[in-house]
Amino acid sequence: MLAEYLVHVGRVNVFLDPETKDIPKCVADLKFPLPLTLSRSTPINPIIRSDTIQLVISCPPVTYSDEIQVPWKAIDLNKDDAVKSTIKCKQCQSFLTSISSWKDLPSANWMEMLDCWSCHTDYPTVLSKRGGPSMFQPTDDCAYLGTSYVLIRLQSLEGKVAYGPNFKLHCSFCNAELGLPNNKDSSNGVRLDKSSICIDDQKIHPSFIVASEILTLRDMYATHKFVIVDGERSIWTWCFVPHLPISFQKSPFSSIEFANSPISTIKLLYQLEVPPDFTKSSEDWMDIPVSSHAFDEISHVLEKGNLSFPVSAQKFGPWKVGLLPKFHKQMI
């Protein structure tokens, strides 16, 4: 059983389990937490359907913070000067490198910001003072943090990583995919995917990272359409509801560790095939590149979320309905 709280319309939808059987008598009382807290005096008007109970709530909408929380920010990782953070391969736990200083990149697309900045300044003069076009050069001790990746100095990973097909970065010990190429980065920096590594033995599920990336890009570019890609496969997604508190009786996300229900999610409409209205001239779809392993995990989460709804709520036209859990710092 799954319940969703539609914040802006003041309604809770309680979806019955797709395997629920119709028994014409009361066999038990079931306590189920709703994804919001109400006083006992709040009027509730239930609308009962074959597979859904709609609760119309006569109270002001509950407000939620619009802050986008991103896994592993600099403030979370920086420690005393004498203590370094250890980075390991998530799959085989092999040591990759250690970092003593972390800095946040200013934007999901920081190179575009630099290009814009260079167009509005005395470029040759500034470059001669700074020694080059990039202000974000990782060192052996300092790494930079993006929304979904860690920018590391390539030389500090010597002997620990190797380039595979399509210039993807792989672990030299277990061949797990660690990073994705990006020709906008500095020549001595490589991107390690946050979902492919452990930092101080902490790991982050790919769905949290992709959810943060979707919300960040949505906020920055006012777009709602994204393509999650691993180089060969694609998931076409619409960010339908950016903030959806849900409660569940049995978690549809068996591969992720959650705090107690309710949790905060993004409600997505998604397809594994190219949408029928897509044309090559469409420029409002934004790519979110992920590793092959992360793609499999995200596909699994979306499918499990979809199957937790009754059949009548699993699709919206040709689109499937899915959920991605949002990250909160209390999770690590």
Curated annotation (Swiss-Prot):
One GO BP annotation of this record: protein autoubiquitination
Coiled-coil ranges (or none): none
Domain of life: Eukaryota
GO cellular component, one term: cytosol
A single GO molecular function term of this UniProt record: cyclin binding
Pfam families the UniProt entry points to: HECT_2
Cited InterPro entries: UBQ-conj_enz_E2-bd_prot
PANTHER family: E3 UBIQUITIN-PROTEIN LIGASE E3D, E3 UBIQUITIN-PROTEIN LIGASE E3D FAMILY MEMBER
Protein name: Uncharacterized protein C1734.10c
